[in-house]
Regions:
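Extracytoplasmic beta-strand/coil segments of soluble accessory domains associated
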Residues: 10-49, 53
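Short acidic/polar hinge/loop motifs at secondary-structure boundaries
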Residues: 15, 49-78
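Predominantly transmembrane beta-strands of Gram-negative outer membrane beta-barrel pores used
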Residues: 41-43, 71-75, 91-97, 103-172, ...
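Gram-negative outer-membrane beta-barrel transporters
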Residues: 116, 447-450, 475-588, 634
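Surface-exposed extracellular loop regions of Gram-negative outer-membrane beta-barrel proteins
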Residues: 149-183, 210, 249-258, 262-264, ...
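Flexible loop and strand-edge segments within Gram-negative outer membrane beta-barrel domains
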Residues: 166-181, 185-244, 248-250, 254-280, ...
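Structural signature of Gram-negative outer-membrane beta-barrels, strongest in the C-terminal barrel
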Residues: 199, 241, 293-295, 301, ...
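Membrane-embedded beta-barrel scaffold of Gram-negative outer-membrane proteins
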Residues: 251-263, 385, 418-480, 484, ...
Length: 671
């Protein structure tokens, strides 16, 4: 994370086999497509607590302190009842940590301090038409982060912060971000094994964002030059208590997450501001029976959200309450895990919503889910595993009620949206390999996921076309996005991953991680009508897809590898990411109206160049990054990082061109 000059943790997630991030949306093994940040099937957690906004269900990546990350755990599929609704597709758990005793003992009275600073610039793209800025001056980004930890008797104290400014490669997408974090943990002096503490993160930012490009030729300019600038504050405060007595462990984790967003377009207020408050508690009790190798975990999770915004049609509140219990049993070389979870959701809206002719103010539903798994050691260093688990996700407020306009594209509400349900299963083999000074783990897995009423962010004609006084269409023909249930779906595939390290000689070693994932995401109800457009025409997966043999906005093949060579004080590393062509998108994106316009209505191309770009990128994307570093002395290190080494043009989805080559210089100090 540090060596790659990671300014947001979501970019580091891209290097994990089977994981992709699109517009902030985490996707594990093709379980999700693209939803513009509304709702998440992947539960992203920091220190075992969700970091997802209560209104839009959006992961708060920018709030995560990259300067204090110990490890990242990825659980693929719905395999544990310890995690709730948003874990339908898997879990990403980011763990922070107090520095090691070795680091602290270097300066016991002063503690441990880490300072990282970087300065980077954005290269010119290969096509001159993409350059909208001064052709003699490159766009720059720069940042500084610090982390300090100190042990004061029985108190562990950490503080950290980050300042980041980015002029951006896309016109208007300027970022100005400041973040501060702290943690305070105390071991009680009177009660043995009683630990309590508090953590917090505070983010103050101004960020520009665009939904789609102006054209393929002007891929770094937003449609109609419209940028949404969000100025806001986000913070979380997390008090917690842990107590162990005998074979019993009690923990209470709590979180208050507050989000304020003030949005404007071209300097004018949009009335799209939103505010939300989230209250979260999780109490967990673990009992270990050592004589029979049995661990019982049981607990309750409660979450209450209050949100207010015109884009969500006023004031809304949501509550989620759950009970869960899981047993883990060891029988010789066999480990067994099984559990159940009961989820209850309710949502209250100040403004009623019409559903089937009735005005509804209150939504509520509940559902149990069951999950289990086996892990068996066949031989030394050889393990086989299998798991099966149910999943369930209640729609977010954004998916149900959002009404807004982004870059002239309307986002429509759908209060009739139903919860999605499903199950996932996996069978896998993990093999440890030792060859001389090299040690690695090879993992191969086959997986399948089934969903009922899958929610998808779908582009279509959901609104009525409007015309100006000259008879020209003034509202994009009523086109826009809406979350809809698309019926039954299935995602199956295989995944191969490898991690390892080794010594070439006494001063040279190598680390590597890589993986390949094949996915076959399909609709099981291709011709079933799941919605109607504004004119009442039935919409099916078949008639709304550019390639109905695969689910929308997904890949079939994804491969990644990262290798780092360390020799004495010098290090060099490289990352490679490949994905094949995103063959299925909303069919309407490929039509003449979108790409060429309609002279009968005096309409130019609405989003020019989508078909042209898809033809150019039909062989997929292959992106290389490279980094070098040199340890100057015991406390200081310099580095140089190049992302998108060959300055390749590529898109994460239609009409969203990714950045050209970037360069960054680093100076890292550890005192």
């Amino acid at each position: 994370i540090e060596n790659k000059n990671t300014t947001e943790i979501q970019t580091a997630m891209e290097q994990i086999p089977g994981v992709n991030i699109t517009d902030g949306q985490a996707n594990i093994r093709g379980g999700s497509g693209w939803s513009y940040g509304a709702g998440s099937r992947v539960l992203v957690m920091v220190d075992d607590m969700p970091l997802i906004s209560g209104d839009a269900g959006q992961v708060q990546w920018k709030l995560i302190a990259t300067e204090n990350i110990n490890q990242v755990e990825v659980i693929k599929g719905a395999s544990s009842v310890l995690y709730g609704s948003s874990a339908l597709n898997g879990v990403i758990n980011i763990r922070t940590a107090f520095p090691s005793k070795k680091d602290i003992d270097k300066h016991p009275s002063l503690g441990y301090t880490k300072i990282n600073t970087h300065y980077g610039f954005i290269d010119f793209p290969q096509r001159s038409s993409l350059i909208w800025w001064n052709q003699y001056k490159r766009r720059v980004y720069k940042g500084l982060e610090f982390f300090h930890a100190q042990k004061l008797d029985n108190i562990n104290l950490t503080i950290g912060g980050n300042v980041f400014k980015d002029q951006g490669y896309r016109k208007g997408e300027v970022t100005d971000r400041k973040r501060f974090n702290f943690s305070l943990e105390k071991q009680d002096e009177k009660i043995k094994n009683l630990i309590y503490g508090i953590k917090g993160n505070f983010l103050f930012q101004s960020t520009g964002s665009a939904l789609i490009w102006d054209s393929y030729e002007n891929g770094y300019i937003p449609l109609d030059d419209k940028i949404t600038t969000t100025s806001g504050d986000v913070f979380n405060v997390d008090p917690y208590v842990k107590y162990t007595i005998g074979n019993n462990r009690h923990s209470l984790n709590t979180r208050y997450l507050h989000l304020i967003n003030d949005n404007e377009t071209k300097g004018s207020e949009t009335n799209d501001d939103n505010r939300s408050r989230l209250f979260y508690t999780d109490y967990q009790w673990q009992k270990r029976f050592e004589k029979i190798n049995l661990l019982i975990t049981t607990g309750t999770t409660n979450e209450i959200v209050y949100a207010q915004s015109k884009i969500f049609q006023g004031k809304n509140s949501r509550s989620n309450h759950s009970l869960y219990s899981q047993i883990d049993k060891k029988l010789g070389k066999l480990n067994i895990s099984a559990g159940a979870r009961y989820e209850y959701f309710s949502l209250d809206s100040e403004d009623g919503h019409e559903i089937n002719g009735d005005t509804i103010y209150h939504f509520a539903e509940a559902k149990p889910v069951f999950r289990g798994g086996l892990n068996y050691q066949i031989a030394e260093g050889t393990f086989i595993r299998s798991s099966w688990g149910q999943g369930y996700r209640f729609p977010s407020m954004a998916e149900l009620f959002v009404t807004t306009n982004v870059s002239d594209i309307e986002i429509f509400p759908n209060p009739e949206l139903r919860s999605e349900k499903g199950w996932s299963s996996e069978i896998g083999l993990k093999q440890a390999v030792q060859f001389g000074r090299f040690r690695s783990f090879i993992d191969i897995a086959a997986f399948i996921m089934r969903y009922d009423d899958m929610m998808e962010f779908t582009f279509g004609q959901w609104g009525e076309p409007e015309f100006d006084e000259n008879g020209n269409v003034s509202n994009f023909f009523g086109l826009g996005f809406k979350s809809v249930n698309v019926g039954k779906t299935e995602i199956s595939g295989i995944e191969l991953s490898i991690t390892g390290e080794g010594k070439i000689n006494e001063i040279t070693k190598i680390n590597f991680i890589g993986g390949y994932t094949y996915m076959n995401p399909i609709s099981l109800e291709l011709n079933k009508s799941y919605a109607n457009d504004y004119y009442g025409n039935p919409i099916t997966y078949n008639n709304s897809s550019s390639d109905s043999t695969i689910l929308k906005y997904r890949y079939r093949n994804v491969a990644k590898i990262d290798i780092e060579l360390l020799r004495d004080k010098f290090s060099i590393g490289s990352s490679v990411r490949y994905n094949d062509f995103m063959s299925n998108i909303d069919y309407i994106f490929t039509t003449d109206l979108i790409n060429n316009g309609d002279p009968n209505f005096g309409v130019d191309a609405l989003i020019p160049g989508i078909n042209e770009s898809r033809e150019k990128f039909k062989d997929g994307d292959l992106v290389f990054d490279i980094r070098v570093g040199y340890q100057l002395d015991e406390i200081s290190k310099i580095g140089f990082v190049v992302n998108n080494l060959f300055n390749r043009e590529y898109m994460s989805r239609p009409a969203n061109m990714m950045p050209p080559r970037t360069f960054a210089f680093q100076l890292n100090l550890k005192i």
